[in-house]
Amino acid sequence: NPEPLPENLTEISSVDKENACDFGIVVDPDVDRLALICENGEMFGEEYTLVAVADYVLSNQKGNTVSNMSSTRALRDVTEGYGCSYASAAVGEVNVVEKMKATNAIIGGEVNGGVIYPELHYGRDALVGVALFLTHLAKKGMAVSELRKTYPNYVISKNKISLTPEIDVDNVLKTMFYI
């Protein structure tokens, strides 16, 4: 299966670990999503790809960030740690791009490993993500698993919720994002 999801990457994770590789890089067939594998064979975490890349970008240039609502607070925490603003957008690349333009964000993306870096173009681009991640890793001079430990550790459960007309969706979202 070409989807860069943990359940589809068990073989490369094993190869990465067995061969003492420094890390593994996996992209999907149209190269708009990126997954990283730590030297120990564990997944870096597709959401944390954007977090790490944003950390690097924000360390060099202050600015806003955007990710979709299917995210943990990790990007928000890293962004606010630099004294910058984070915004969330509806799921979908077009929604993230619209919010990035509206907030003048310098980095954003979807938590499926889709990095959007408007300095180059407004589209998810795994190769841009690879370049930014590798630069960040080289400057930090640490193993991929050690870099991952520097970010807030959140767990997200992506469950479908049935909505009825009586439910105030705006209030639910406001409550979720400002707890």
Regions found by a protein language model. Give the residues of each.
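Phosphate-binding chemistry for phosphorylated carbohydrates and sugar-nucleotides
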Residues: N1-K140, N153, F177
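Catalytic-core signal marking the mid-to-C-terminal active-site face
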Residues: G141-I179
